[in-house]
């Protein structure tokens, strides 16, 4: 089951976040409409595990529905029906309110493609996704763009395998992904961009719970072109060629290089399409490498980070005169929005 992070439920709200472990509302009837038994009472049902004494922090007051044991089905209570020990309660999910592209933790923005970048401040890029196969190893990056959708590179996916082979990890800083903030959610559907661009959408089997460590990035306006020399950031756990910080999320700042310049003979020599963008140090030394395929290139605009690129390809890794190439997300916003709306 997906690990539910510890999220603060709004005080007294009659709605729940995630599986409702933090629910402290006043619902006191089961789905069948039967009143709940008081947690402190021993009639009609005798019980010793979940009482206000044994679980003083679980909010077991009166006979309100609660989820003291983190049951995946949500809040429950002992019932006043002598023939039914316990039952679940019908509590709606809270509307998740979040601002896309606004981390709760300020990013380091280290000067220096991720080979020569630096270790990120934990959870400062809260839309960063680690894509895993059944083997559990990180093999590609991705970006959370709404509670139920992740954008990644098409070349990361093997369409023969189908969605059940993939899981996304959210809220991680360490590649091992064992922190309490981690949410692990199976993928339910894969959508490859129809014109065969190197971009794909993953629908999650259940929505991510938006927390301080898990926040979507914003999508750009359709067909927006990032100006030359705009400073943007890439993040990932990828191949770092013996450089420092393996296993922790890394970041690097990169200037965008306009296509006209990037396609010059001495750089990428006409290989970059208008639906792609270049970013990198023409001197070499920083770049996103294998293993960060599918990960984000975000640019700060006004007061938020906007996903402008999906890491796609590069010639080698952090080589002089060979900037990284990213899918230009703005080109595909109509397809992204249409797919999210239809499915």
Swiss-Prot record:
Residues 141-343 are annotated as: Plasmin light chain B. The modification Phosphoserine is found at residues 130, 221. Its main location: secreted. Residues 114-341 form the Peptidase S1 domain. Residues 1-140 are annotated as: Plasmin heavy chain A. One of its GO terms (cellular component) is extracellular space. GO terms for biological process: blood coagulation; fibrinolysis; proteolysis; tissue remodeling. InterPro entries: Kringle (IPR000001), Kringle-like (IPR013806), Kringle_CS (IPR018056), Kringle_sf (IPR038178), Peptidase_S1_PA (IPR009003), Peptidase_S1_PA_chymotrypsin (IPR043504), Peptidase_S1A (IPR001314), Serine_Proteases_S1 (IPR050127). The active site is at 155 (charge relay system), 198 (charge relay system), 293 (charge relay system). It catalyses: Preferential cleavage: Lys-|-Xaa > Arg-|-Xaa, higher selectivity than trypsin. Converts fibrin into soluble products. Residues 1-17, 41-120 form the Kringle domain. It is found in: Secreted. Its EC number is 3.4.21.7. GO terms for molecular function: serine-type endopeptidase activity. Pfam families: Kringle (PF00051), Trypsin (PF00089). Converted into plasmin by plasminogen activators, both plasminogen and its activator being bound to fibrin. Cannot be activated with streptokinase. Disulfide bonds join 15-94, 36-77, 65-89, 140-156, 232-299, 262-278, 289-317. Kringle domains mediate interaction with CSPG4. Plasmin is inactivated by alpha-2-antiplasmin immediately after dissociation from the clot. Belongs to the peptidase S1 family. Plasminogen subfamily. Plasmin dissolves the fibrin of blood clots and acts as a proteolytic factor in a variety of other processes including embryonic development, tissue remodeling, tumor invasion, and inflammation. In ovulation, weakens the walls of the Graafian follicle. It activates the urokinase-type plasminogen activator, collagenases and several complement zymogens, such as C1, C4 and C5. Cleavage of fibronectin and laminin leads to cell detachment and apoptosis. Also cleaves fibrin, thrombospondin and von Willebrand factor. Its role in tissue remodeling and tumor invasion may be modulated by CSPG4. Interacts with CSPG4 and AMOT. Interacts (via the Kringle domains) with HRG; the interaction tethers PLG to the cell surface and enhances its activation. Interacts (via Kringle 4 domain) with ADA; the interaction stimulates PLG activation when in complex with DPP4. Angiostatin: Interacts with ATP5F1A; the interaction inhibits most of the angiogenic effects of angiostatin. This is Plasminogen. It comes from Ovis aries. The gene is PLG.
